[in-house]
């Protein structure tokens, strides 16, 4: 059974790093995506920045130690993702941002939390942003 709900209810996230590493293995195909998702469960009513990789009609979400391959239509429906609020990057574009910015993302959107009520303290690090990329990985990107 698909456990996308579990991904969307995780309090701590490594999605930008996980998706960034994943796109590095899909140099000729696929897109890195930074977008806004709507949380479920304890994160219901909270919209937050998230990252994943799309290859054809599949979404690959390796955040929080998971290795999910989910049909894109289902992923977008469950996360109530608006494609107009997403940024899509081919490998070369993602690699350029990684080199220029020195972190996994987000690069062109805030990736911040958008909601009407306060975030519980335990949920304060949804989708950790601007995690630095180790030098050895940056060196591989510049080759």
Regions found by a protein language model. Name each.
Residues 1-7:
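Enriched but not universal
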Residues 7-143:
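A structural boundary/capping signal
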């Amino acid at each position: 059974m698909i456990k996308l709900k579990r991904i969307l209810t995780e309090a701590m996230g490594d999605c930008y790093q996980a998706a960034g590493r994943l796109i590095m293995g899909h140099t000729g195909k696929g897109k890195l995506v930074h977008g806004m998702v709507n949380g479920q469960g304890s994160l219901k009513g909270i919209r937050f920045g998230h990252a994943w990789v799309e290859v054809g009609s599949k979404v690959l979400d390796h955040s929080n130690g998971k290795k999910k391959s989910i049909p894109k239509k289902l992923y977008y429906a469950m996360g109530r993702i608006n494609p107009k609020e997403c940024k899509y990057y081919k490998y070369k574009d993602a690699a350029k941002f990684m080199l220029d910015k020195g972190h996994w993302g987000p690069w062109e959107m805030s990736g911040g939390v958008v909601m009407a009520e306060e975030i519980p303290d335990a949920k304060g690090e949804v989708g950790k942003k601007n995690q630095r990329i180790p030098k050895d990985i940056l060196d591989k990107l510049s080759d």
